[in-house]
Amino acid sequence: MQKQAELYRGKAKTVYSTENPDLLVLEFRNDTSAGDGARIEQFDRKGMVNNKFNHFIMTKLAEAGIPTQMEQLLSDTECLVKKLDMVPVECVVRNRAAGSLVKRLGIEEGIELNPPLFDLFLKNDAMHDPMVNDSYCETFGWVSKENLARMKELTYKANDVLKKLFDDAGLILVDFKLEFGLYKGEVVLGDEFSPDGSRLWDKETLDKMDKDRFRQSLGGLIEAYETVARRLGVQLD
């Protein structure tokens, strides 16, 4: 399947059309951003690592019964995916306190959250992805009540699957975001799952193994991503 016209260029991925109107090519670039795109740097191998990482995770989620847009890997940095009508709201699950939750509530980082918290954010960089709720979604017509309920159900199911997967690899799944879309009327998991959109800590040391290494200028970003991938069993080379 050959990529054709560039349809969308995000902060770290580019989307291309194909000869099949129902399929797209998703290309992972080496770009890494923070501050809603205010700071961007390039890291060798990052596109490759995130592409293969994402394919691995999406495969695990599909095996658990979660519908995903993933079709197949095409190259080190590209995959073939279903074309979704994306919902403009992202779902976030928090198993431990970190990031904006700590700032917003003034609580200690790392506190376990039981049951996990579920948040919704409007995907809008210019507005810094404001937090919203189901009432906003219904009033502004972003997603139907039924489809939002399905998104929440699938997000919690993904959390159950991924918490165990990462725990078995000696990692804590602190939090993560998921994006969904509609494919022929069905709610389907889209976009990506990688250390760019999740927080992962080492169980023993609590070292951060995700994009917080870039946000907080800790260094060793790609080394951390590759360590996580290899612990999970992702074939990088």
Curated annotation (Swiss-Prot):
Keyword terms: ATP-binding, Ligase, Nucleotide-binding, Purine biosynthesis
EC number: 6.3.2.6
PROSITE patterns to which the protein is assigned, alphabetical: SAICAR_SYNTHETASE_1, SAICAR_SYNTHETASE_2
GO molecular function: ATP binding; phosphoribosylaminoimidazolesuccinocarboxamide synthase activity
CDD domains: SAICAR_synt_PurC
CC per GO annotation: cytosol
Pathway(s) it belongs to: Purine metabolism; IMP biosynthesis via de novo pathway; 5-amino-1-(5-phospho-D-ribosyl)imidazole-4-carboxamide from 5-amino-1-(5-phospho-D-ribosyl)imidazole-4-carboxylate: step 1/2
Keyword Ligase: yes
Catalytic reaction annotation: 5-amino-1-(5-phospho-D-ribosyl)imidazole-4-carboxylate + L-aspartate + ATP = (2S)-2-[5-amino-1-(5-phospho-beta-D-ribosyl)imidazole-4-carboxamido]succinate + ADP + phosphate + 2 H(+)
Biological processes, Gene Ontology terms: 'de novo' IMP biosynthetic process; cobalamin biosynthetic process
Enzyme class: ligase
NCBIfam families: purC
Family designation: Belongs to the SAICAR synthetase family.
Name assigned to this protein: Phosphoribosylaminoimidazole-succinocarboxamide synthase
